[in-house]
């Protein structure tokens, strides 16, 4: 059996990092696609020359032709404009919607059997639009949001309690933006819920509330510090974790922007929920019990996503 094929749409910072991680983990051969001539080819050549040093045999190629993604097992989409300081994810809507149309049509024509992971912002709207334009089953198109947001939450929690990140499990629901819902009571340190650790006097509610707020603004904090560009190492690592779950049929429970149809009282849109990812793609949506505060927070997030979808439909009537 031949190697798996990973197609990366967008050869920017996230795309390049995805290519390196996929090759290092030997997930398969990598095709790095971009509309800018020379960029994917140059990055692919540079990355290929890491192989003799890092010891991987994965082939990495660059292309400007969607035909070269044909037969891809996994496609990770990062194409589009990145956030700039002062720009919200939603400001990106008009520009990146057009990009998703081109990408969706390219996937539909060349790799209709792939498992597609969208990273382009504003995430919850872009993954929905990409699914609409590509026509793929909802179970085979998912957005990378909660894995990254939970990683940020976990990092801050590990710092607060001065413990290994390996012992921290956190959980973020809702849209990938300021309305996300970090669920503190389902977040644990080696199985001990964070609220219990607060009761033990190991932290304070004020500090945990500040961590929740910082998690919500995690992407913006990095954008402001960088001055130009946005986060790319952790987003790429998050996308690779999702790809590994699919390729290895790992049945991992990961928070992702998945198509929700009745669960959590939500109908017909993509929003961050815990899902099982295996060889069938999104195999199950895990519906956990939420308290009133988390339910209210999720509803605010859902309403924000709905507004974005309505804006998408106005910008491109074919989506209506």
Swiss-Prot record:
<feature type="binding site">
    <location>
        <position position="83"/>
    </location>
    <ligand>
        <name>substrate</name>
    </ligand>
</feature>
<dbReference type="GO" id="GO:0006099">
    <property type="term" value="P:tricarboxylic acid cycle"/>
</dbReference>
<dbReference type="InterPro" id="IPR001236">
    <property type="entry name" value="Lactate/malate_DH_N"/>
</dbReference>
<dbReference type="GO" id="GO:0006089">
    <property type="term" value="P:lactate metabolic process"/>
</dbReference>
<dbReference type="Pfam" id="PF02866">
    <property type="entry name" value="Ldh_1_C"/>
</dbReference>
<feature type="binding site">
    <location>
        <position position="121"/>
    </location>
    <ligand>
        <name>substrate</name>
    </ligand>
</feature>
<dbReference type="InterPro" id="IPR036291">
    <property type="entry name" value="NAD(P)-bd_dom_sf"/>
</dbReference>
<feature type="binding site">
    <location>
        <position position="96"/>
    </location>
    <ligand>
        <name>NAD(+)</name>
    </ligand>
</feature>
<dbReference type="InterPro" id="IPR022383">
    <property type="entry name" value="Lactate/malate_DH_C"/>
</dbReference>
<feature type="binding site">
    <location>
        <position position="152"/>
    </location>
    <ligand>
        <name>substrate</name>
    </ligand>
</feature>
<feature type="active site" description="Proton acceptor">
    <location>
        <position position="176"/>
    </location>
</feature>
<feature type="binding site">
    <location>
        <position position="89"/>
    </location>
    <ligand>
        <name>substrate</name>
    </ligand>
</feature>
<dbReference type="GO" id="GO:0004459">
    <property type="term" value="F:L-lactate dehydrogenase activity"/>
</dbReference>
<dbReference type="InterPro" id="IPR015955">
    <property type="entry name" value="Lactate_DH/Glyco_Ohase_4_C"/>
</dbReference>
<comment type="function">
    <text>Catalyzes the reversible oxidation of malate to oxaloacetate.</text>
</comment>
<feature type="binding site">
    <location>
        <begin position="10"/>
        <end position="15"/>
    </location>
    <ligand>
        <name>NAD(+)</name>
    </ligand>
</feature>
<protein>
    <recommendedName>
        <fullName>Malate dehydrogenase</fullName>
        <ecNumber>1.1.1.37</ecNumber>
    </recommendedName>
</protein>
<comment type="similarity">
    <text>Belongs to the LDH/MDH superfamily. MDH type 3 family.</text>
</comment>
<feature type="binding site">
    <location>
        <begin position="119"/>
        <end position="121"/>
    </location>
    <ligand>
        <name>NAD(+)</name>
    </ligand>
</feature>
<keyword id="KW-0560">Oxidoreductase</keyword>
<dbReference type="GO" id="GO:0030060">
    <property type="term" value="F:L-malate dehydrogenase (NAD+) activity"/>
</dbReference>
<dbReference type="InterPro" id="IPR011275">
    <property type="entry name" value="Malate_DH_type3"/>
</dbReference>
<dbReference type="InterPro" id="IPR001557">
    <property type="entry name" value="L-lactate/malate_DH"/>
</dbReference>
<feature type="binding site">
    <location>
        <position position="34"/>
    </location>
    <ligand>
        <name>NAD(+)</name>
    </ligand>
</feature>
<keyword id="KW-0816">Tricarboxylic acid cycle</keyword>
<keyword id="KW-0520">NAD</keyword>
<dbReference type="Pfam" id="PF00056">
    <property type="entry name" value="Ldh_1_N"/>
</dbReference>
